[in-house]
Structure formats: structure tokens, C-alpha cells
Amino acid sequence: MTTLNSSNTLSSTFYLSGIPGYEEFHHWISIPFCLLYLVGIMALVGNAVLLILVRAEKNLHEPQFCFLAMLALTDLGLSLSTMPSVLAIFWFDVRDIGLNACLTQMFFIHTLSSVESGVLVAMAFDRLVAICAPLNYTKILTHYTVACLSGAALIRGATLLAPLPFFLRTFPFCGANILSHSYCYYPDMLNLACGDITFSSAYGLVFVLCTFAVDVVFILASYMKILDTIMKLETQDRNWRSLHTCACHLCTVLVFYLPLISLAVLHHYTQDTSPILYTTMSNAYLLMTPLLNPLIYSLKSRQIQAALRKRFWVQRVIAGE
């Protein structure tokens, strides 16, 4: 019986429905979604440019820009993990995906999301030290500390999410194997498994609450402390500039975390949510944040702007010669 189940599981093919219940309208729905995914291509370009700049400019080899580079690399991974299957659905109506490919995509999406969450925590800590303890910044955020924070984010994501594909492989998949997303999502796949999924489902929910929820609390606490420090500054212009930067950062954090945590909770507790809401939320944090991060965190940085101007000026001079 175990051999049969294993064989059935390994030969399973899944069907990515995109927006379940609205398949006949996909031709029209694809227009705004395709625009969103074209924006995702812009996100790929923006993050690639950021990585090149941080690597090329020595004055950008500072903790905050190291975290920015890691964030850009994570965003690149998220975009490349999701965009192919999403574009295949809406542009070419290709919906079938094998179990191995589905498990691989699911692992990378969830792992990279966890890594990005850890990087956002590290970036919040970086800003906390820079604004609240500027004189001790270089003492606290040494190269060793930056390496430890980056490594912890990567190891946490890979280690805690490694069991998910193995959980799914222990179950046979009997039925139509229709996934209600445009990519492979753990709770979605788990709902198609035959057997007792109580532990596997609880593990997924506890992971989300104990990582992403804890990260959100730390980030919000950090920015509250930052705002408290900023409000005590005397220079009104500095107040406005710092407040504006913090507000932009918080908006990006909310765009990433709210859909992610809401999706996990809704999948666990209800099956009656509108499929359009599911699809919109699932694509918001996977496609919008890779676009917003270079704009919010990078282009607002004077050092990044200076590096961009320098690079373009050099290219123009070379072209002129």
C-alpha cells in the first residue's frame, strides 16, 4: 500500500487554475495581470541594477547596502520562481505542472519569502542603530554582525521550510489535483492530500506565526523607537525627511506581510474566501514588493543616486569618445 501511494504521489500532475471559477474570463482578466507581471519584469531589472551598483561601488560596501543587495537578490529569486508559471497561465494557457517541479517551486517561494522577512528585520535593526545610536553604529554593525544576520536569515528559511516537501511526499494525491493559485502554494497543495494533514497543516501555520508574525512585531517596534527618536530631534527638515523615509519603508513592509500572513490564516480557517481575493493577495506580495523595494529602499538613497549618476555619466563620456 505504501509503495502504491508513493508511486501515485510521484506521478502526480497538478493543474494551476489561476483564478478558479473565472476561467472563462481569463482572456480579459489577463490584461491587468499581464500589466502587473510586466511590472514584475521591471522589478527584475531594478534589482539587477542594484546588485551591480553595490558590487561595483566601494562606497556602497556598508551594512545597509549589503542588506539591500541581499534583499535585491532575494527579490530576484522570488520573481524568477513565480513569474514563469504565472505568465504561462495567463499568456499561453499552460497550466499543468509535475509534482517535482511544483514542490521545487513551492520550496523556493516559501524559503525566499522567509529569507526576505529576515532581511527586512536586519534592515530595520540597521536603521534602528543608525538613528538611535549613530555613534556606536560601526561598533555594533561590524562585518561579522552583518554576516551573522544575513546567514541567520538564510539558514532559518532553508532549515524550517525543508520539511514541507517531505510532508507532502508522505501523502497520496487523489482527485483532480487542481490548485487554486497561479503557482504552487503549500496550504493549497496540502488541501489536495489524502490522509490526516492535521500535523502538517499546524506546522505550516505555526511557522508563519512564529517567524513572519514575530518579524513584524520586531520591525514595528524598531520603527516605533525610530519615530520616537526622530520626534525628539530639533531640526524640522530632518524630522520631515526621516519621517517620510520611515513611512515609505513601513508601507513596503505592510505590502509584503499583510497578504502573506492573511493568506496563511485564511487557508487554515476558511474555504469560502473569494478566489479573486486569494489570487490578488498571493500575487501582491510576490510581485509588488520586488518592484517597490528598489524604488523605496534604493532610489531614495542619496548614495545610490550618486552611484547611478556616476555610472551613467561615465558611460556617456565613453560613448562620446
Label every PLM stretch briefly:
Residues 1-321:
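Transmembrane helical core of 7TM receptor-like proteins
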